[in-house]
């Protein structure tokens, strides 16, 4: 499956929760809280899903929350998590959180994960002093993530940092705002406590166990 390129507000309306990360999305969803499409307003309520449909929906919500990952990539994280001795669902979230584009987003350099992916892909981000342009790069404890010096004058990066609330940064990360730099203190834990939307991880585990 290719990457989704349609309007992200439609995804918010499809799922009934904000997966786009856009600041305006909650207001739009409150005003148009019905499925997108020609008959969305007419029928209003979302169709009752089958057991399979519920599990598929939960998987899709998590994929799009993390920027619209391709199925192959998402399944790779699930397979890695399922081989761990730890809880599969929690390990899946840990791998997703450790993605470089997610860390750039969590530190406040980007306003959405999609914007963070672009920053990484276009070479604006350094890890331990070296350019890394792979959004899926998995960070490790001790890694230092920073915006390249020549990129620090990009208006939206400066604006994002000025508006970041230090309390919104997970405890496994540290931010040095003045130096456009962050550090991975430890591996992420209890991710569901600060995840932007509720996710039923058991549904995702059950989805892949039946396909």
Swiss-Prot record:
UniProt feature coiled coil, ranges: none
Domain S4 RNA-binding: 98-161
Record keywords: Ribonucleoprotein, Ribosomal protein, RNA-binding, rRNA-binding
CC annotations in GO: small ribosomal subunit
InterPro entries for the chain: Ribosomal_uS4, Ribosomal_uS4_bac-type, Ribosomal_uS4_CS, Ribosomal_uS4_N, S4_RNA-bd, S4_RNA-bd_sf
Pfam families the record matches: Ribosomal_S4, S4
Keyword Ribonucleoprotein: yes
PROSITE patterns on file: RIBOSOMAL_S4 (PS00632), S4 (PS50889)
Entry-linked Gene3D superfamilies: Ribosomal Protein S4 Delta 41, Chain A, domain 1, RNA-binding S4 domain
Single GO MF annotation: rRNA binding
One BP annotation, GO: ribosomal small subunit biogenesis
SMART domains: Ribosomal_S4, S4
Subunit-structure text: Part of the 30S ribosomal subunit. Contacts protein S5. The interaction surface between S4 and S5 is involved in control of translational fidelity.
Family: Belongs to the universal ribosomal protein uS4 family.
Function: One of the primary rRNA binding proteins, it binds directly to 16S rRNA where it nucleates assembly of the body of the 30S subunit. With S5 and S12 plays an important role in translational accuracy.
Official protein name in the record: Small ribosomal subunit protein uS4
């Amino acid at each position: 499956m290719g990457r989704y390129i349609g309007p992200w507000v439609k995804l918010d309306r499809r799922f009934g929760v904000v997966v786009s990360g856009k600041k305006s999305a909650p207001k739009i969803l409150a005003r148009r809280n019905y499925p997108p499409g020609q008959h969305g307003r007419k029928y209003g309520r979302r169709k009752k899903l089958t057991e399979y449909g519920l599990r598929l929906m939960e998987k899709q919500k998590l994929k799009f929350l993390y920027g619209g990952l391709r199925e192959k990539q998402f399944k790779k994280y699930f397979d890695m998590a399922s081989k761990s001795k730890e809880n599969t669902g929690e390990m899946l979230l840990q791998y997703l959180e450790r993605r470089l584009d997610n860390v750039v987003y969590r530190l406040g350099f980007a306003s959405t994960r999609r914007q963070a992916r672009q920053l990484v892909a276009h070479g604006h981000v350094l890890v331990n002093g070296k350019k890394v342009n792979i959004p899926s790069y998995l960070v490790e404890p001790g890694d230092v993530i920073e915006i390249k010096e020549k990129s620090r004058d990009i208006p939206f990066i400066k604006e994002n940092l000025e508006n970041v609330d230090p309390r919104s940064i997970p405890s496994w990360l540290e931010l040095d705002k003045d130096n456009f730099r962050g550090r991975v203190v430890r591996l992420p834990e209890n991710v569901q406590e600060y995840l932007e939307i509720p996710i039923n991880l058991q549904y995702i585990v059950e989805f892949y166990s039946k396909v």
